[in-house]
Amino acid sequence: MPGNSFGKLFRVTTFGESHGPAVGVVIDGVPAGLPLTVEDIKFELEFRKPGRLYVSGRREKDEPEILSGIFNNRTTGSPIAVIVRNTDVISSFYEEIRYKPRPGHADLPFIMKYGYENWDYRGGGRASARETVGRVIAGAVAKKLLMLADTWIAGHLRSLGPEELNEEVTFEEVLCSKYSPVRASKKVLEEKYEALIKKATQEGDSYGGIAEVITKNPPIGLGEPVFDKMKAELAKAIMSIPAVTGFEYGLGFMVSKMKGSEANDEIIRKDNKIGWKYNYAGGILGGLTNGEDLIVRCAFKPTSSIRKPQKTIDLRNLEETYISVIGRHDPAVAIRGVTVVESMVALTLVDHAMRAGVIPLVKLTEEQGNIVQQRWERYVRSCKPMEESQL
């Protein structure tokens, strides 16, 4: 099963299955001298962890174990291997799925490609979103390394089901959304999202949503003009996330309804620099980052595992039947998915930053390491619960 690695210079390989002993990641290409601790990784993992309000009831501790690549809280330049053990597995929930592939899931395509006898039906196996633990671990490393360029990445849930954000949002509000149980950047929206989740849970159903990720101060010129355009690289990265069904940046599909005179973003002087008036392009022009905020959005489909009975085929007799999926599943995968999107944006940007020479390939100086650590600590402090002013 190829296709488990991402990146060229900052190369990430994830491994493990939903109900296997562990999931994990190997990160190759991290320069030496980057300050890095288990706590740095846990900070990001906490926001995709199950067992919290409004997400999957699977109570995983998600404690990362660093196996290699770090000594005295600094990277050594060798591959970083990290595992997270699966400690709350109930495979008995999936016995029915063994013979009845779930609508909306990868079950049947996996059986068709790899063979029924080779299919790990427990929790979705390799196709499970549990795989994204490795992405978030690598994303934490990438986010910290990007602090060398003072590049910050944060996301929020722009819509959930029929409810959506219809006003401007500040980057500070997006940072604060990390502590919202439904990743809302506004209190009033949080209440609407919570009501929807409660409704879906009662009905045995689920909702989809749109995640938006904003990158502040991205290095200028990341990406390559032809096949490795930044928009193409981000699209591939984000579309590889389980349950993601669409991608856009800047004005996205809305631009198709506009005139050129409306869609063209005028070039102006801004803070004594050359810039763009509205950032309609979402920080990417000609396949290159232009220094404006990098703004991407992606659509998550509703969670496929739902209690409502749905038609399927019993593989034992090839007769039509019904399945009602039991177990512990997210009523909206988009909530925890926001952190995964942030991670994939970080992995894409850090790889291109290294390719462009913005981040050193071999090692960080002691001064650079100290700068990274100071900025990381400021980032962690900035991610705080919403204030009453956001009501």
From Swiss-Prot:
As recorded in Swiss-Prot or TrEMBL, the protein's gene is named aroC
- List of residues binding FMN: 126-128, 286, 301-305, 328
Name its co-factor(s): FMNH2
* Species classification: Archaea, Thermoproteota, Thermoprotei, Sulfolobales, Sulfolobaceae
Report the GO molecular function annotations. chorismate synthase activity; FMN binding
**This protein's record includes keyword Amino-acid biosynthesis:** yes
Query: Entry cofactor note text?
Result: Reduced FMN (FMNH(2)).
Q: Name one GO cellular component term.
A: cytosol
Similarity field: Belongs to the chorismate synthase family.
Q: What is this protein called?
A: Chorismate synthase
Task: Look up the record and give one Gene Ontology term from the biological process aspect.
Answer: chorismate biosynthetic process
Q: What does this protein do?
A: This reaction introduces a second double bond into the aromatic ring system.
Q: Name one Pfam family in it.
A: Chorismate_synt
Any idea which UniProt keywords this protein has? Answer: Amino-acid biosynthesis, Aromatic amino acid biosynthesis, FAD, Flavoprotein, FMN, Lyase, NADP
Q: Which residues bind NADP(+)?
A: 48
Q: Does the keyword Protease apply?
A: no
Catalytic activity reads: 5-O-(1-carboxyvinyl)-3-phosphoshikimate = chorismate + phosphate
Give the EC number.
Answer: 4.2.3.5
Q: In which pathway does it act?
A: Metabolic intermediate biosynthesis; chorismate biosynthesis; chorismate from D-erythrose 4-phosphate and phosphoenolpyruvate: step 7/7
InterPro entries, per the entry: Chorismate_synth, Chorismate_synth_AroC_sf, Chorismate_synthase_CS
